[in-house]
Amino acid sequence: MGASIDDYSLVHKNILHSEDLLKYILETSAYPREHEQLKGLREVTEKHEWSSALVPADEGLFLSMLLKLMNAKRTIEIGVYTGYSLLTTALALPEDGKITAIDVNKSFFEIGLPFIQKAGVEHKINFIESEALPVLDQMLQEMKEEDLYDYAFVDADKSNYANYHERLVKLVRIGGAILYDNTLWYGSVAYPEYPGLHPEEEVARLSFRNLNTFLAADPRVEISQVSIGDGVTIXRRLY
C-alpha cells in the first residue's frame, strides 16, 4: 500500500491542502513511476516518528527530471534523513555520478542504506556525518574549479538556509542549481502572523519568510519558487 491520504502530516505538509487533488497526483502520476527501492524506502519511512520529513513522491519525480535535464554528475545534499531524495538523486545520476551527502544523524541514513544498496547506487554516495557548515567551509578552502558541483539540494535545519546559500553559491558552478526544500512551509509564509504553530515551526516559518525575500533580491541567482510538496525554490547561479 502507498502512503495514506488520511495521514494528516502528509496533507498538512503539502502546499495543495487538498486531499482529493493530492491523492489524484500521487496515485495517477507519482506512485506508478516510483522506483521499486524508492517505494520500499518510502513505506518504511512512513512508519517512522518523523515521517513528515519525507520528501513526497511527486517531488521526488520532479527532482529526478531536473537532474536528468541538467545532465548533472556532481551533486551535494544537505540534510539526508532516511535518504529518499538521496536515492532519487543517485538513481538519476549517470554511473560515474557522485553525491556528497551531509547529515548529523547517520542512524537515519542507515534506515535507507539497504534500499540504496539494492538499487546498486551506493558507490555514488559519500556520506558525511557532521554539521554541514564546517564541511562546506572546508570544501571552500580545498575546492578547485573542476570540482564545482552541478546541483545542490538543501533539506536541513531551516534557520541555516541563508548560511548554506552563501557557501553553496560558491561551491556550485555557474549555471548550476541550488534547491531549497520547504520554502512555503505549509503555506504559512504568506501571512505576517500564523497562530497555532509549535515554537520550532514558527522559527522555521519566519526563517523562510526572510529567506524568500533574500533569494528574490540576490543578483547572483535567478529563482523559481515551485508549488510542489511544501514548496521548492530553485536558484540557478548566474555568476
UniProtKB/Swiss-Prot annotation:
One BP annotation, GO: methylation
Keywords, ordered alphabetically: Alkaloid metabolism, Metal-binding, Methyltransferase, S-adenosyl-L-methionine, Transferase
Pathway named in the protein's UniProt entry: Alkaloid biosynthesis
Listed GO MF terms: metal ion binding; O-methyltransferase activity; S-adenosylmethionine-dependent methyltransferase activity
Pfam family, one: Methyltransf_3
Names of the cofactor(s): Mg(2+)
Recorded catalytic activity of this chain's protein: norbelladine + S-adenosyl-L-methionine = 4'-O-methylnorbelladine + S-adenosyl-L-homocysteine + H(+)
InterPro entries in the record: Cation-dep_OMT, SAM-dependent_MTases_sf, SAM_O-MeTrfase
Gene3D superfamilies: Vaccinia Virus protein VP39
Positions with a binding annotation for a divalent metal cation: 155, 181-182
Residues reported in the UniProt entry to bind S-adenosyl-L-methionine: 55, 77, 79-80, 85, 103, 132, 157
Protein EC: 2.1.1.336
Family assignment from sequence similarity: Belongs to the class I-like SAM-binding methyltransferase superfamily. Cation-dependent O-methyltransferase family.
Function noted in UniProt: 4'-O-methyltransferase converting norbelladine to 4'-O-methylnorbelladine. 4'-O-methylnorbelladine is a precursor to all Amaryllidaceae alkaloids such as galanthamine, lycorine and haemanthamine, and including haemanthamine- and crinamine-type alkaloids, promising anticancer agents.
The name this protein goes by in its record: Norbelladine 4'-O-methyltransferase 3
